[in-house]
């Protein structure tokens, strides 16, 4: 009977876990729909912005703005984005592995690397290994363009002042609910805006601008960094909630399987106990009959 009580206790514990994972799945699903809507709503603006900037960038020389100026890379800065919370499968671990691999490759090339983590998980991991610059945590659950502007301001001025020579952004690109792929994007300098916009040359519209091209690109280039960072934040948010939803759904199914296994085990133990009791009764009856 002690074995039966142990199994019943395990079933009850798994049932409680299942209730938690199911609730977390529902919460993640709701947050995912919200973050996915934000991400998809921002895409048309981002694409049109990059289209306009693309048509403008090909008309100015690389020395028209400091953000276009390429120089020999000696020191780089890496902005890496993760979630603040866990329980989202391999979402953060794949991002951290990609970031660490990229940083090690650059160090092996003889470059100095400054790391700027955005999100608690990536910050907690790298603070034990590297000196961090302008790290941020507890910002991914609720954010707007203001956060993207703040991050951009932290990285643009040091680049213009030649404190570092290249800026890279590493984040989880949203593919679908069950797939998020780490992406490495060079943000600064910006010699190939047209490639990022994915616009074929023959389809690019040639606009007439007022004021001059140089004045306008001076206004738009910082905004371009804002747009890229905000897009990465939105994709990170959607990917995190999608990954958590998938992870909690998988955990709920695992609970169902465990409950089925424990229930079968319970029935077997109970049947064995009943059989043993019946054998004792039959044996006692036969002994009385002979006596």
From Swiss-Prot:
The keyword Cell inner membrane applies. Keywords: ATP synthesis, Cell inner membrane, Cell membrane, CF(1), Hydrogen ion transport, Ion transport, Membrane, Transport. The keyword Metal-binding does not apply. One of its GO terms (molecular function) is proton-transporting ATP synthase activity, rotational mechanism. PANTHER family: ATP SYNTHASE GAMMA CHAIN, ATP SYNTHASE SUBUNIT GAMMA, MITOCHONDRIAL. GO terms for biological process: proton motive force-driven plasma membrane ATP synthesis. It comes from Syntrophus aciditrophicus (strain SB). This is ATP synthase gamma chain. F-type ATPases have 2 components, CF(1) - the catalytic core - and CF(0) - the membrane proton channel. CF(1) has five subunits: alpha(3), beta(3), gamma(1), delta(1), epsilon(1). CF(0) has three main subunits: a, b and c. It holds the Pfam family ATP-synt. InterPro entries: ATP_synth_F1_ATPase_gsu, ATP_synth_F1_gsu. One of its GO terms (cellular component) is plasma membrane. NCBIfam families: ATPsyn_F1gamma. It is found in: Cell inner membrane. Belongs to the ATPase gamma chain family. Produces ATP from ADP in the presence of a proton gradient across the membrane. The gamma chain is believed to be important in regulating ATPase activity and the flow of protons through the CF(0) complex. It is a peripheral membrane protein.
């Amino acid at each position: 009977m002690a074995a039966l009580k142990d199994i019943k206790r395990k079933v009850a514990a798994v049932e409680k876990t299942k209730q938690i994972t199911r609730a977390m799945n529902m919460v993640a699903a709701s947050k995912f729909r919200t973050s996915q809507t934000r991400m998809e709503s921002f895409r048309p603006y981002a694409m049109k912005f990059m289209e306009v900037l693309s048509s403008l960038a090909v008309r100015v020389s690389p020395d028209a703005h400091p953000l276009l100026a390429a120089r020999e890379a000696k020191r780089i800065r890496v902005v890496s984005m993760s979630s603040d919370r866990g329980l989202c499968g391999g979402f953060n671990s794949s991002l951290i592995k990609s970031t660490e691999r990229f940083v090690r490759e650059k160090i092996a090339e003889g470059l100095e690397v400054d790391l700027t983590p955005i999100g608690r998980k990536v910050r907690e991991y790298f603070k034990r290994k590297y000196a961090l610059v302008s790290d941020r945590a507890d910002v991914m659950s609720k954010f707007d363009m203001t956060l993207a502007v703040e991050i951009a301001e932290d990285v643009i001025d040091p680049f213009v002042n030649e404190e570092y020579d290249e800026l890279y952004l590493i984040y989880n690109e949203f593919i679908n609910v069950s797939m998020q792929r780490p992406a490495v994007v060079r943000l600064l300098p910006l010699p190939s805006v047209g490639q990022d916009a994915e616009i074929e040359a023959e389809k690019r519209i040639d606009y007439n601008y007022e004021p001059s091209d140089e004045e306008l690109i001076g206004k738009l280039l910082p905004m371009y960094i804002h747009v890229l960072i905000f897009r990465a934040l939105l994709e990170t948010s959607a990917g995190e909630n999608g990954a958590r939803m998938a992870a909690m759904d998988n955990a709920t199914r695992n609970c169902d399987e465990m409950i089925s296994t424990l229930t079968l085990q319970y029935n077997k133990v109970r049947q064995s106990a009943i059989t043993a009791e019946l054998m004792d009764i039959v044996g006692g009856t036969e002994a009385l009959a002979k006596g």
